[in-house]
UniProtKB/Swiss-Prot annotation:
Its cofactor is Mg(2+). The modification Phosphothreonine is found at residue 91. Belongs to the NDK family. It is an enzyme of class 2 (transferase). The gene is ndk. The modification Phosphoserine is found at residue 122. Homotetramer. Keywords: ATP-binding, Cytoplasm, Kinase, Magnesium, Metal-binding, Nucleotide metabolism, Nucleotide-binding, Phosphoprotein, Transferase. CDD domains: NDPk_I. InterPro entries: NDK-like_dom, NDK-like_dom_sf, Nucleoside_diP_kinase, Nucleoside_diP_kinase_AS. This is Nucleoside diphosphate kinase. It comes from Bacillus cereus (strain ATCC 10987 / NRS 248). ATP binds at residues 9, 57, 85, 91, 102, 112.
């Protein structure tokens, strides 16, 4: 089944949105298979934002993501990558629709509450950066037969 990586960023953790965000994805019917509160190191941040290394805002990205704890998660379900992107809303909170996470809670592009993988390939790469294989739990949820 398809998996995606989501991360409540330091601003979302500090503003106490972890529970709200987890609840939204659970209510949608997705299955949480890995989660941890963690401090991102500069090394992990560099791997995570590798495609932005040469961009002028790279240092700010690393500084922000390492400024406080994050809540890293792996979710699975049919179409979870695209659906999660839609649930998060556009990157710029002022462009994000009401009802989306960023539309409801985001303040600025830099402090937009949540990160989510933008493709299956990105999800695989990001999951491998933040989680060891043994940290992911494969289990059956009885409600899946009512969803899929």
């Amino acid at each position: 089944m398809e998996k995606t990586f989501l991360m409540v960023k330091p601003d979302g953790v500090q503003r106490a949105f972890i529970g709200e965000i987890v609840a939204r994805f659970e209510k949608k019917g997705f299955q949480l298979v890995g989660a941890k509160l963690m401090q991102v190191t500069p090394e992990i941040a560099g791997q995570h934002y590798a495609e932005h290394t040469e961009k002028p805002f790279f240092g700010e990205l690393v500084d922000f993501i390492t400024s406080g704890p994050v809540f890293a998660m792996v979710w699975q379900g049919e179409g979870v990558v695209d659906t999660a992107r839609n649930m998060m809303g556009k990157t710029r909170p002022h462009e994000a629709a009401p009802g989306t996470i960023r539309g409801d809670f985001g303040v600025t592009v830099a402090k937009n509450i949540i990160h989510g993988s933008d493709s299956l390939e990105s999800a695989e790469r990001e999951i491998a950066i933040f989680f060891k294989e043994e940290e992911l739990v494969d289990y059956s949820k009885l409600m899946n037969e009512w969803i899929y």
